[in-house]
Amino acid sequence: MGELPYKIQELKLRRIEELNNKLRNELARERMTASNACLSIIDYTSTHKDYAVPEVWGYPMVGENPYNNTMRKNNFARSHEETSACCTIM
């Protein structure tokens, strides 16, 4: 019966050590304050164009539309016609 409390104490010690390791890892993680995060978001939104807000950035030029898929469709059709294989790997 003398071993049972020792085993329980050993299990408790192991759990505490695991918790300490988790807390050390969390403490070592790089942190950013809320004000710095907000400044980073403001900087990103002011330097990257978002055409979903045309009041701010205007409308994109026809050739500069990043959401236009006609170029991709034309290239796919050409590459499909040139090969005799049944599949195209991209």
Swiss-Prot record:
A lipid is attached at residue 86 (S-palmitoyl cysteine). SMART domains: G_gamma, GGL. Signal peptide: none annotated. GO terms for molecular function: G-protein beta-subunit binding. Residues 88-90 form a propeptide. Pfam families: G-gamma (PF00631). GO terms for cellular component: heterotrimeric G-protein complex. It is a peripheral membrane protein. Keywords: Lipoprotein, Membrane, Methylation, Palmitate, Prenylation, Transducer. One of its GO terms (biological process) is G protein-coupled receptor signaling pathway. The modification Cysteine methyl ester is found at residue 87. Its main location: membrane. InterPro entries: G-protein_gamma-like_dom, GGL_sf, Ste18_fungal. A lipid is attached at residue 87 (S-farnesyl cysteine). It is found in: Membrane. Belongs to the G protein gamma family. G proteins are composed of 3 units, alpha, beta and gamma. This is Guanine nucleotide-binding protein subunit gamma.
